[in-house]
A protein has these predicted regions:
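Hydrophobic membrane-targeting segments
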Residues: 1-44
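Loop-to-transmembrane-helix entry motif
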Residues: 8-11, 104, 108-122, 153, ...
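Residue-level signature of catalytic and energy-coupling elements of molecular machines
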Residues: 9, 23, 60, 75, ...
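Alpha-helical transmembrane segments of integral membrane proteins
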Residues: 12-25, 116-123, 167-171
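Structural signature of transmembrane alpha-helix termini at the membrane-water interface
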Residues: 24-34, 135-138, 173, 177
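Predominantly long cytosolic amphipathic alpha-helical stalk/bundle segments
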Residues: 38-128, 132-141, 177-204
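Membrane-interfacial helix-loop-helix connectors in multipass membrane proteins
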Residues: 139-151
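Pore-lining and gate-forming transmembrane alpha-helices of multi-pass membrane transport proteins
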Residues: 148, 152-175, 179
Length: 204
């Protein structure tokens, strides 16, 4: 690995830095979805819909007070808020729920920009490194007149492009995967909002 870092030139180091950032962001997201949100399965989603349709706000607040996933947090907070503010208007309650949902979405999207930068910058830095390497190689050709110097220089210069793509492609795959996970959670949050407002209207 260190050999390729040396022969690839100075642009290998910022790409390596982006690789470390990308790995850290991916591990953080995997921990979020598979450890912190591990209880957010199909059964939980069905149960929360069932409880919103059949249970009181008091009972709902009790059921979901110890859960840490976004759906449970919104349902619990919205239920408890209604119990202490029963005279609130529908528009105020709807605004409250939307604010809670936006807060949960912002937490889910935290650090997404890191993967975005790695996806965009890594291949660009790799291409820049290759171009700089080729300029040096052709400069060596004009000075020495030996074509073998150019071939060797271009071979080394291409390491940066390859390394940049090796960083960007996995980052892109994970980025798309995480976006799909977020979209699924957001769809469920929208359903929760509808059910909460429906329940609220039923109590008016």
């Amino acid at each position: 690995m260190f050999y390729y870092m040396q022969v690839g030139g100075i642009f290998m180091w910022p790409i390596f830095f982006l690789a470390v950032l990308s790995l850290a962001a991916v591990l953080e997201k995997l921990f979020l979805y598979f450890v912190r949100l591990r209880d957010l399965g199909s059964k939980f989603k069905l149960d929360i819909v069932k409880n919103l349709n059949n249970q009181t706000f008091e009972k709902i607040g009790e059921i979901y007070q110890n859960y840490k996933n976004p759906l449970a947090k919104v349902v619990c907070a919205a239920s408890n808020f209604y119990l202490t503010n029963k005279n609130i208007s529908k528009s105020e309650y709807e605004f409250l729920i939307k604010t809670m949902i936006d807060d949960e979405i912002s937490k889910l999207e935290k650090n997404n920009w890191i993967l975005g930068i790695c996806i965009s910058a890594s291949p660009q830095l790799g291409l820049l490194g290759t171009i700089v390497g080729m300029i040096k190689s052709f400069g060596a050709l004009s000075a020495a007149g030996d074509p073998t110097l150019v071939a060797g220089g271009i071979s080394e210069a291409l390491y940066t492009t390859a390394f940049g793509l090796l960083v960007a492609i996995p980052a892109l795959v994970f980025h798309v995967y995480f976006i799909n996970k977020n979209d699924s959670i957001m769809e469920n949050l929208e359903k929760i909002e509808f059910l909460l407002l429906k329940k609220f209207e039923g109590l008016r």
